[in-house]
Amino acid sequence: MRVGFGYDVHAFVEGRPLVLGGVKVPHDRGLLGHSDADVLLHAICDALLGGAALGDIGRHFPDTDPRFKGISSLLLLRQTVELVRRAGFRIANIDTTLVLQKPRLAPYIARMAEEIGRATDLPVSSVNVKATTTEKLGFAGREEGVAAYAVVLLRSDGR
């Protein structure tokens, strides 16, 4: 068994949709990034890649590559899952935390877990998404951006 940890952060900007966990969340701003800037899925990708000792998301999907401009991070997650499988691992579970002041995410958490489960071929019972605030402290508390943390457990597929 191996554990992978991922972290990502993106700044809020006007004129972009807010996509978290593969779900469009109504908000007056979205996140800045080369892809759809889904900070949660990026943290999961990094956790998966780290657990399999395959580097990080920037190595596999660089922001200098025009193929990834505006791409759905669900596609990046699916490609990451395939890389992890080819390395001889399968995902046991995923646990995540989003850190932001607003918007409130309670109505969207279940859909995020479903999207992540679909992209990783995991049952929803093996995917956990949480959201918290920083009590108005720091960049997240000032509503300047969103941070995400992810932990994954990988099992060897016995190769």
Curated annotation (Swiss-Prot):
Catalytically driven reaction(s): 4-CDP-2-C-methyl-D-erythritol 2-phosphate = 2-C-methyl-D-erythritol 2,4-cyclic diphosphate + CMP
CDD domains membership: MECDP_synthase
Enzyme class: lyase
Residues that bind 4-CDP-2-C-methyl-D-erythritol 2-phosphate: 8-10, 34-35, 56-58, 61-65, 132-135, 139, 142
GO biological process: isopentenyl diphosphate biosynthetic process, methylerythritol 4-phosphate pathway; terpenoid biosynthetic process
Reported cofactor(s): a divalent metal cation
Subunit comment: Homotrimer.
PANTHER family: 2-C-METHYL-D-ERYTHRITOL 2,4-CYCLODIPHOSPHATE SYNTHASE, CHLOROPLASTIC
Its biological purpose: Involved in the biosynthesis of isopentenyl diphosphate (IPP) and dimethylallyl diphosphate (DMAPP), two major building blocks of isoprenoid compounds. Catalyzes the conversion of 4-diphosphocytidyl-2-C-methyl-D-erythritol 2-phosphate (CDP-ME2P) to 2-C-methyl-D-erythritol 2,4-cyclodiphosphate (ME-CPP) with a corresponding release of cytidine 5-monophosphate (CMP).
HAMAP family: IspF
Protein name: 2-C-methyl-D-erythritol 2,4-cyclodiphosphate synthase
Gene source species: Syntrophobacter fumaroxidans (strain DSM 10017 / MPOB)
Gene: ispF
